[in-house]
């Protein structure tokens, strides 16, 4: 995708195609979690999908669904900032959130996100505790009321502060069910997935095998950029 978030969270050299090919054929294997999610739509349909990074409903989905394609072609992931600014103002919505079969809790939110990993574009750690292989979902509820609340969220995220703020609530669980008092737009891994009235997400531990840089591969420097090592030529057919 535009942000290449899964590759970023896996520390792959995203700007070097040759090195990525080398990793694909000769790297080391790692098992990571995926997330199975069921959406209930306005017409009562239930659809099932799988994602690897972040899914959600509300403000984040507004951004993904309203980012201009031509701007993404020009500016890449920075295009999301323009849509984000346009959608900053908006009302909060009532939702209920239940974790691991527990008692549903009510929130007034701008967005609810379910994450498998936490790094965004630009190296921003939205959920520093989120890990791709911990068998847990990271649930984030954002409930800002005005610009000052958004500023608090931005400062906490950028500075990676461990202090809690009332408008940014996070928890971990293996399963999360969210019901919306009114239909809300949704997204999975940056793709708009329509308006929904409920979601039910479950972690699928160790369900996907990915290839990573081999531990003894000296062709990748600490900054994630590959050194000038050629891709091996295929053996000639005899």
Question: What are these language model-derived features?
Answer:
Residues 60-63, 105-108, 120-123, 147-151:
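Short acidic/glycine-rich loop or secondary-structure boundary segments that cap or lie
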Residues 99-106, 131-132, 141-238:
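ATP/nucleoside-binding phosphotransfer catalytic cores, i.e., glycine-rich phosphate-binding loops
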Residues 71-79, 120-122, 128-149:
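Gly/Ser/Thr-rich active-site loops/lids in small-molecule metabolic enzymes
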Residues 41-43, 126-131, 190:
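Short, flexible, solvent-exposed loop/turn segments with mixed acidic/basic and small polar residues
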């Amino acid at each position: 995708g535009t942000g290449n978030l899964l590759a970023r969270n896996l520390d792959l050299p995203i700007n070097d195609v040759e090195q990525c090919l080398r990793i694909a054929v000769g790297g080391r294997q790692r098992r990571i979690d995926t997330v199975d999610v069921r959406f209930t739509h306005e017409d009562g349909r239930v659809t099932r999908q799988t994602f690897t990074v972040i899914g959600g409903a509300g403000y984040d989905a507004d951004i993904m669904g309203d980012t201009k394609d031509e701007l993404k072609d020009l500016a890449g992931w920075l295009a999301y900032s323009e849509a984000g600014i346009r959608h900053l103002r908006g009302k909060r919505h009532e939702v209920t959130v239940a974790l691991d079969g527990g008692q549903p809790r009510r929130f007034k939110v701008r967005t609810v996100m379910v994450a498998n990993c936490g790094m965004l574009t630009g190296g921003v750690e939205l959920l520093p505790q989120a890990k791709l292989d911990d068998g847990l979902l990271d649930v984030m509820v954002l409930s800002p009321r005005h610009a000052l609340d958004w500023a608090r969220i931005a400062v906490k995220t950028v500075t990676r502060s461990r202090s809690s703020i009332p408008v940014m609530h996070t928890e971990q669980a293996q399963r999360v069910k969210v019901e919306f008092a009114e239909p809300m737009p949704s997204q999975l891994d940056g793709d708009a997935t329509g308006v929904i009235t409920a979601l039910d997400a479950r972690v699928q531990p160790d369900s996907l095998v990915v290839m990573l840089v081999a531990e003894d591969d000296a062709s990748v420097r600490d900054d994630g950029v590959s050194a000038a090592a050629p891709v091996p030529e295929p053996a000639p057919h005899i």
